[in-house]
């Protein structure tokens, strides 16, 4: 993709800030639903999808709640609540439907380059955790969305599902796992690149190496963006609608916009590390996404997982994440990001959340100081035979947890202007996997007047639009069959 030439002043109906999966998804929606709208994208880096959307910067799981235990909460009475898992599964189905539509209509090609079928497994150790996992399985198995899920404590069965992890295990160790065959691995970096290739072909203006420095509301209701390119040349860009999808960089721009709902919002950055396997023989022995259970007192982002990934055209194996303490909101950000994000309007909320989350800060600092030997010890809970020389450390992307009302939130959140002329996406997990649902929320809240005329097209693109798939077993079966065929997941 080449950088677009730009005048000192410019205009577009729609402006997307940040060239990641969220902006790419919203751009695809608007290109399909309102092709008459002009579209401009500003990205501060030299290519699209280099920050949180990049395949080396996220877990790439295709978060559909098939194996992530932090989406199913155990209540005080011992029951397991699966409502959030069902909701995330429904949301991920929307993502699969949009990608299928884009492939089916030739907007993007070669789905095998960004999505693969891979089993999803939940893995726990100890009797108490085994009982929790069994209750989770029993609750989820009642839904057709999780049809085919299996549960076992039997070591021989577990060895069939995850042979690498079961080598040289103590036969008396209490283990349990749930297994579901139709999980996915999604390379969101590759998908992001495909989405922006499509947008550029549809005459979207892609401006790389362009940093948005300021956002101001004009008297006529439009937004004025002050943009600086790599050579330091300043540009003024006006737009009717602005979406801030710059990952961790979204918060400072949201604050500069001055919209009411953005004034009390803060952010807390968390960095991440993964161990990546460099031994092809070891990589070949594992073919699954295996998610464990966070240790007592550890935050949700610390859930350990051993992931088969498909990156740069080959199978890879990653373990993590190991969290870390940072002041940066972006991997290529500044140590001033966090301090300068604290303003008079959010100071009380950020301070309150900071006091409440001192244990989290302590945990992150401890994680940041772990040696490779300590990280290998964590890995050996999953892979007892893991050898130091087979594993290297890679630095993953940044996530910025939303702080609102004195509370730290562990999800994604859309914040918008009252008139719907500006929206920003903040937060993290499940993130990219539910990007389609997140951008649908933007369409509904920001383009309400146009939504009625888009209904038929939206239903064509997303057959489950407006429906709860948990209550539609027949529709779900039809959608799954189509998705598997179009995205080459059936074999």
Curated annotation (Swiss-Prot):
InterPro entries in the record: FAD/NAD-bd_sf, MQO
The protein's enzyme class: oxidoreductase
Cofactor: FAD
EC number: 1.1.5.4
Keyword Oxidoreductase: yes
Catalytic reactions on record: (S)-malate + a quinone = a quinol + oxaloacetate
GO molecular function: 2-hydroxyglutarate dehydrogenase activity; L-malate dehydrogenase (quinone) activity
Assigned keywords, A-Z: FAD, Flavoprotein, Oxidoreductase, Tricarboxylic acid cycle
Pathways per UniProt: Carbohydrate metabolism; tricarboxylic acid cycle; oxaloacetate from (S)-malate (quinone route): step 1/1
Alphabetical GO biological process terms: tricarboxylic acid cycle
Family, similarity comment: Belongs to the MQO family.
Name of protein: Probable malate:quinone oxidoreductase
Organism: Actinobacillus pleuropneumoniae serotype 5b (strain L20)
Classification of source organism: Bacteria, Pseudomonadati, Pseudomonadota, Gammaproteobacteria, Pasteurellales
Gene designation: mqo
């Amino acid at each position: 993709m080449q950088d677009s030439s730009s005048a000192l002043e410019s205009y577009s109906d729609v402006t997307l800030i940040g060239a990641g999966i969220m902006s790419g998804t919203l751009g695809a929606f608007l290109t399909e639903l309102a092709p008459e709208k002009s579209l401009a994208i500003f990205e501060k880096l030299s290519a699209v999808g280099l920050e949180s959307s990049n395949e080396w910067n996220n877990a790439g799981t295709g978060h559909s709640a098939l194996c992530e235990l932090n989406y199913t909460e155990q209540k005080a009475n011992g029951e397991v609540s699966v409502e959030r898992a069902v909701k995330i599964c429904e949301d991920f189905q929307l993502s699969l439907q949009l990608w299928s539509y884009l492939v089916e209509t030739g907007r993007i090609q070669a789905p095998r380059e960004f999505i693969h079928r891979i089993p999803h497994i939940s893995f726990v150790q100890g009797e108490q955790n085994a009982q929790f996992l069994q209750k989770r399985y029993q609750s989820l198995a009642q839904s057709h969305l999780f049809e085919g899920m299996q549960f076992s404590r039997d070591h021989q069965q577990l060895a069939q599902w995850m042979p690498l992890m079961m080598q040289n295990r103590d036969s008396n160790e209490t283990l349990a796992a749930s297994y579901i065959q139709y999980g996915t691995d999604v390379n969101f970096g590759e998908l992001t690149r495909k989405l922006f290739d499509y947008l550029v072909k549809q005459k979207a203006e892609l401006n790389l190496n362009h940093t948005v420095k300021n956002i101001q509301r004009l008297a006529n209701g439009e937004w004025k963006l002050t943009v600086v390119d790599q050579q330091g040349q300043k540009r003024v860009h006006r737009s009717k609608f602005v979406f801030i999808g710059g990952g961790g960089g979204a918060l400072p721009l949201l604050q500069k916009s001055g919209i009411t709902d953005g004034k009390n919002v803060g952010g807390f950055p968390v960095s991440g590390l993964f161990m990546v396997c460099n031994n092809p023989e070891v990589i070949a022995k594992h073919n699954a996404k295996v998610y464990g259970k966070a240790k007592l007192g550890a935050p949700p982002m610390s859930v350990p997982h051993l992931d088969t990934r498909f990156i740069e055209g080959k199978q890879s194996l990653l373990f993590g994440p190991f969290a870390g303490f940072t002041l940066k909101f972006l991997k290529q950000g500044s140590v001033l990001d966090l301090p300068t994000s604290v303003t008079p309007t959010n100071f009380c909320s950020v301070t309150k959340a900071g006091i409440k989350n001192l244990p989290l800060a302590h945990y992150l600092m401890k994680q940041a100081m772990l040696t490779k030997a300590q990280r290998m010890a964590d890995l050996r809970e999953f892979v007892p035979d893991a050898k130091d020389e087979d594993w290297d450390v890679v630095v993953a992307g940044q996530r910025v947890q939303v702080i609102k009302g004195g509370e730290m939130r562990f999800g994604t959140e859309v914040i918008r202007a009252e008139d719907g002329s500006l929206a920003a996406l903040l937060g993290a997990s499940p993130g990219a996997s539910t990007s389609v649902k997140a951008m649908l929320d933007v369409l509904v809240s920001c383009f309400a007047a146009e939504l009625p005329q888009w209904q038929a097209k939206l239903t064509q693109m997303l057959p489950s639009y407006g429906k709860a798939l948990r209550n539609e077993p027949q529709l779900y079966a039809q959608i799954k069959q189509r998705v598997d065929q179009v995205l080459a997941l059936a074999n």
